[in-house]
Structure formats: structure tokens, C-alpha cells
Regions:
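Membrane-embedded alpha-helical bundles that constitute the cytochrome b-like, heme-associated redox core
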Residues: 2-266
Length: 266
């Protein structure tokens, strides 16, 4: 049996056998330690940025601005319906041929859809994670009375849900023509008139556009705060711009179903 220690002629002196680790050269141990991966070095800068609260707010703000730009362009395209069927149908054809001849048929439209989808996903995920982080940071309810917030602020989350459900309905209605009974492929003007000739089509669209307006009013101002306002004067200007932009977009979108209901567009 091998013993860990042995005693020589001097009983008071005990000699210990060196362990396997002690017999290993110090240089080899150091090189082995250096070869081990360090977790801190594996985390990339984009991942650190995304994990931070500022990063999530920035993603939410930038994606919101992308969607806002799309809404402005979409509203301007919708208003072409007031110039007649030929003008509106030509606009629908241009959407599928934009970028030609460099891009193939509908490639430009699909590129816009992909960018918009990424913006929607980034906006929704960052909003959800920020909400969960805020709840975890304040698990207990405050006893004192919370400051009064605007109606748009209190309904921000539900407004996002309403808009998300409307997007699904809108695609099934005017893109895939699944729920539009009187739809005709290749006739966007007639399809819009058919949709807004029903009470439920008008109800769904108008409620959704009101939710969009409230969401834009609060979201535009929140994005400005996240990206930096700068001064009190600029703050007042951006707040007025948020209110005006929400009003113009809501009125522009709602004007189309109202025009169909009143017979202005038929």
C-alpha cells in the first residue's frame, strides 16, 4: 500500500509526496488556463447592447420610426382612391413593379414586407421584454396614488394588440382576399370598395385606425425621448408634431371608409 507520507531516519521530519498537479510545470498550467474560454469575451457588443434597457428602447424607437414611415407612405397611396379607379389600380400595379427592371416582379414589394416584418418583430419583442423587466423591477404595488397618465399611455399595450390583430385581418382581407367575399384579383379599387361596403369592414378598420393614432401619438413622443430631445423648446415642438402626425394619419386612413359609406367613392 502506497502511503501519502513517509518518515526517514529523523522521526521528527515528515516528507510529503508531491501531487500530480504540483509535478506539472507551472508554464504548462498557465498555458492550459489561458486556453480555457472566458465567458466575458464571448459576449458580443450587439448582444450586450440588446440586453441593456437603453438598447431595447433604441430598437423599439428605430423600429417604430420605420413603421411610421411606412404608414405615411401607405396613407398617401390610399388617398389615390379619390382620383378614380384607374389611378388607384395603377398605384397597385406600381407596387408590384417598383424597382424594375433591376428587381423582378414583386421583389421590391417583398423587400418592403421583409423589412416591415423585422421592424414589427423587433418592436413587439423589445416592448414585451421592457414591460416584463419593469414588472420585475417593481413587484410590489405602490401605496401612494400614481400620477395621472394620458389615455394613450394607459392603453398603449392594448392598442398594440389591437393593431397586431388588425394587421392579420387586413392581410386576409385585401392581400390574400380570403375574407373578402366580393374580391377580384388584380382589382384593388373594387376590393377596397367591397370591403368598406360592409358594416363589419368599416367597424374593424375605423377602430384599428383610432388605435393606430393613439399609438403613434404616444410612440412618436417616446421615441423622441429615447433618441434624445435636447431642449425644452424642441420638446414642445416634438410633442406638437406627435399630436399633429397622429391626427393627420388617423384622418387620412379613416377618410377612405367614410368616403365609401357616403357614396363619394363607389
Amino acid at each position: 500500500m502506497a502511503l501519502a507520507t513517509r518518515t526517514d531516519r529523523n522521526p521528527s521530519r515528515t516528507v510529503q509526496h508531491p501531487s500530480k498537479r504540483d509535478r506539472q510545470p507551472k508554464r504548462d498550467r498557465q498555458s492550459k488556463r489561458d486556453r480555457q474560454p472566458k465567458r466575458d469575451r464571448q459576449v458580443s457588443v450587439p448582444r450586450l447592447f440588446w440586453r441593456s434597457t437603453v438598447g431595447k428602447k433604441t430598437v423599439m424607437a428605430v423600429s417604430g420610426l420605420i413603421m411610421l414611415g411606412y404608414l405615411v407612405a401607405h396613407m398617401m397611396g390610399n388617398l389615390k382612391i379619390f382620383f378614380g379607379a384607374d389611378e388607384f389600380n395603377a398605384y397597385g400595379h406600381w407596387l408590384r413593379t417598383m424597382g424594375a427592371p433591376v428587381l423582378h416582379y414583386s421583389w421590391g414589394l417583398w423587400l418592403v414586407r421583409v423589412v416591415l416584418l423585422l421592424a414589427v418583430v423587433g418592436h413587439a419583442v423589445s416592448a414585451y421584454q421592457l414591460s416584463r423587466r419593469d414588472i420585475k423591477a417593481r413587484p410590489a404595488k405602490y401605496v401612494h396614488k400614481r400620477p395621472r397618465s394620458s389615455y394613450a399611455t394607459r392603453t398603449m399595450r392594448w392598442g398594440g394588440v389591437i393593431v397586431g390583430l388588425f394587421v392579420v385581418w387586413h392581410l386576409l382581407d385585401l392581400t390574400t382576399l380570403t375574407v373578402n367575399e366580393n374580391a377580384q384579383a388584380g382589382h384593388p379599387y373594387e376590393n377596397v370598395v367591397a370591403t368598406f361596403s360592409t358594416w363589419y369592414g368599416n367597424a374593424v378598420y375605423i377602430v384599428a385606425m383610432l388605435a393606430v393614432g393613439l399609438h403613434i401619438r404616444h410612440g412618436f413622443w417616446s421615441a423622441a425621448q429615447t433618441l434624445g430631445v435636447g431642449s425644452a423648446t424642441r420638446e414642445r415642438i416634438l410633442r406638437a408634431a406627435a399630436n399633429g402626425l397622429a391626427l393627420v394619419l388617423t384622418a387620412g386612413f379613416v377618410s377612405v371608409p367614410v368616403a365609401v359609406m357616403t357614396g363619394w367613392v363607389s
